[in-house]
């Protein structure tokens, strides 16, 4: 779009900050919502995208006053919206583990979409799930949720992660140091992951 020095109320804009608390859309997980507030105006952020060179593009509409280049601003993430996304993302980890337990270790994640109010999880399998298999998967996920299992994140070498049995996304390229997410005291679920998650398995009350 067109580069502008200032934007007034009602204008849709994209803002780049020198640093940000916002999570950008990546890995199938949607970006944060929130507010960016300056001395002379504010904007509602409804999408965040990350460019190839690592810049975070905060997309939204000016809701009051005017925002200008070089303004000093405060960036505030919508905490409830972020919590809902984290809950959904954590649930995908539980779902993948349950699917592999019920159907077999051949099951691999083929894609996903994680939003604040729903998830889509694509996986490899040679047949549609039976009603019995579906019920087993559902029960296993619900049991993990009700257990309130701890969610533990660790950074380690890719070799150490593989030794611990961490699941990796097929076709994904990883660096020498990776983030490993384990759910449960005994690492019942263990995956490489860069998304935002809860500190315990998702509660129906979250």
Regions picked out by a protein language model, each given a short descriptive name:
Residues 1-201, 205:
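A glycine- and charged-residue-rich anion-binding loop/surface
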């Amino acid at each position: 779009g067109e580069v502008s020095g200032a934007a007034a109320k009602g204008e849709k804009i994209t803002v780049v900050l020198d640093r940000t608390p916002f999570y950008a859309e990546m890995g199938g997980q949607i970006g944060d919502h929130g507010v960016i507030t300056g001395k002379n105006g504010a904007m509602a952020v409804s999408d965040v995208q990350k460019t190839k060179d690592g810049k975070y593009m905060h997309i939204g509409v000016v809701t009051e006053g005017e925002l200008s280049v070089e303004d000093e601003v405060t960036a505030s993430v919508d905490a409830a919206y972020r919590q809902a996304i984290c809950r959904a993302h954590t649930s995908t980890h539980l779902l993948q583990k349950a699917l592999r337990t019920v159907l077999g270790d051949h099951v691999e994640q083929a894609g996903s979409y994680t939003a604040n109010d729903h998830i889509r999880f694509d996986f490899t399998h040679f047949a549609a799930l039976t009603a019995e298999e579906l019920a087993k998967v559902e029960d296993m996920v619900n049991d993990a949720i009700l257990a309130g299992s701890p969610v533990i994140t660790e950074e380690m070498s890719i070799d150490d992660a593989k030794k611990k049995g961490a699941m990796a996304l097929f076709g994904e390229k990883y660096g020498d140091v990776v983030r490993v997410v384990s759910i449960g005291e005994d690492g019942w679920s263990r995956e490489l992951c860069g998304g935002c998650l809860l500190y315990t398995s998702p509660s129906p009350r979250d």
